[in-house]
Amino acid sequence: MKQYIISLICSSCLLLSSCNYLDTEPGDAISSDHFWETANAAALEQYCNLYYPKLIKGHGDPLAWNIGSMISQEYQSDNLLASGASAITFGQNTKLTSNSDWNWSTVRGCNAFLQNYQKSPASEMDKKKYAGEILFFKAFDYYNKVCLFGDVPWYDSPLDKNSPELYKGRDSRTVVMASILKTIDQAIEFLPRKTKVYRVSRDAALLLKARGDVIVTWKEM
């Protein structure tokens, strides 16, 4: 009987210790429950760093020429990508049926930052600066989507695979451009004029706003 009780106690201890191990945070993903409450300025900067190579081709290399992107995105021009000169000559060239531009991971990541960054213990100056970068990236990504697709769905919050908003229709180009310009205005307010080398500044946001204004003005003409 005594041996049975000892075995039972040992088994209980193993079960309790196993629960502690199962409750540990994943090492390869950001936990929304704890990341933002402990994210210092360096962590916010690293979060922003994810979007520089995604949206700014050749970022960090003043001599970079992204030839692959120039070729693969030729479908955006009147000279559609062809397998050879003969395909154009004999009218056999066809449009690409798919591409990676209809992707919403950047928008989702930006919305997650904007929804949670105020929880960070970083200084208000750092929080505003990095929020300005994220606002710029969200506006820039949407600007590119409008240039490619026209009407697109506008999302203001991070969604998961079960969110019903994933199945919403496209918002009109006019509505989306108004939201883009509003986002850029907030980025201009948050971003400093002088930044580290290769980081988004207020002047970059002003340039993006000018490009957005051109689209709005052209559409109204």
Model-derived regions: residue spans:
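Acidic, glycine-rich segments characteristic of secretory precursors and extracytoplasmic regions
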Residues: 19-66, 174
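Short coil/turn linking the two alpha-helices of tandem helical-hairpin repeats
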Residues: 146-147, 153, 195, 215-220
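Short, solvent-exposed turn/loop segments enriched in Gly/Ser/Thr/Pro and often Arg
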Residues: 62-79, 153, 199
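Bacterial Sec-dependent N-terminal signal peptides
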Residues: 1-28
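Conserved, well-structured interaction surfaces
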Residues: 41-45, 50-57, 79-149, 165-178, ...
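Short linear capping/connector segments at secondary-structure termini
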Residues: 28-32, 90-91, 157-165
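Aromatic-lined, polymer-binding surfaces characteristic
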Residues: 151, 155, 198-205
